[in-house]
């Protein structure tokens, strides 16, 4: 298949619906609610123990999707939602030759409004050609109590962060205000509510956090297993799938010292509190619509932007992060990320299902009669929402405007309302050297530019049985389609390179974020079978400078003992690695079998190419 054929296969959905002269007799209101870094299993309706009665109500009175996919990253999903195509296809978020969804809905007579986190590329949400009303912030994260410098009400910078302010409440308040204005003016509305919850910083009221303290002392494995069992009871997952086990990046609960378990319980309690308070805000949105008599004829779509985030944090600072105080940055760890994404593999930033699987709840009483509480197994994706909303609202895509790129999604409105089968187009996934191509029921996926894997998503959506060796031709065909489409949309640089044969362990992406000149480590990061007698080695793309590093240590710890390093080193300019590209220590003590270790490096312990401090 040549490049143009590949692109045409992805664009088929837009040809299908745009050619039909659909005209709605009425224009229902639309609310899209986007959570930030919410895992697949966090909501009660998806197996979670967090108290989310309002979202559970929407699911129980509407339709929940079990095979909805987003993209691996906040910003790439947000662009895909607004553009109706992948982030790279939309000019890496530039929207070149792209007509954003709100702008098109405006042309169709809708009042378009947004409250929350933008982080969706180069288009400015303050532009009245995008949103008639806007309140929120532009970047990727914010302090939920005192904000940041990128908060705006329309074009006016917002600085009114008074004591008691919190982002979730503010976004809910603004959404209610904006919807009230539209109802008063008797115009249909598109309301985009993009909560920053539960992205870090995990900030919530003390009384909400306290409600969850102690609930997570059973540990990662027990909480995840309980979620998985509830998912089976709900019918969300296939019992034939093997739940993905955790890797070395997840510290084993039974090895953690008691003090660390208490900290980990508190970290997840903070996360649960943030989700809980978001659900409370959504409850207020529902109550407003009910009181206004608009709930039955309003389509509400709730979704997350990617799978659960991973962040082991720092043993030096985690206990000091107070969720109910400003200027703190509480996070949740890799272990809780594994829990959030149950039963799937990996986390945010990958192209495996742990990053892509997300909740999608559709609530529309007047349009979903007979579907109350149903689970829809259609493999819909975030790029399908744009064409679905066009068909719902009767707004036509300007198919004769040849300057515009075609949408790559396909409307699932008929499947939603009539329960007809959904014919999914091929899916192109990407983020920072990780990539995937999904076609029919098969998925080729690569992590960090490593070898392609192949999975049957019907039999093995948890990605535990790699078929690449057994089916090399199919693996090669799907990989070639990914490469051809990447070329068609003009991807360049390392993100579009042909994959290699070396597989970096989980977390390599984050290591390179903090040390971009890092080439490799020995033992490899997240290594399952490190040799018992070993050395510690870090290789860089430029020379290492150890001058001025005295008193800055590298330390090796057992997971079970955070107080006493099993090895530490304070290298200086006399070390043999000075001026070389490899920092090597051959005095590491013998490692114990079946034991987890990690390395901590003091800031400024060495520099790379003089200017790059690590």
Feature locations, PLM:
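N-terminal secretory signal peptides that target proteins for export/translocation
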Residues: 1-5
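Bacterial N-terminal signal peptides
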Residues: 8-20
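Formylglycine-dependent sulfatase
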Residues: 12, 23-448, 452, 459-480, ...
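Compositionally biased, intrinsically disordered low-complexity regions
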Residues: 12-14, 311, 550, 607
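Surface-exposed loop and edge beta-strand positions of immunoglobulin-like domains
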Residues: 71, 455, 586-589
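Short polybasic amphipathic segments
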Residues: 148-154, 454, 553-556, 604
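Glycine/proline-rich low-complexity spacer/linker segments in large multi-domain proteins
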Residues: 497-502
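Acidic, low-complexity Ser/Thr/Gly/Pro-rich repeat segments typical of extracellular/periplasmic
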Residues: 514-614
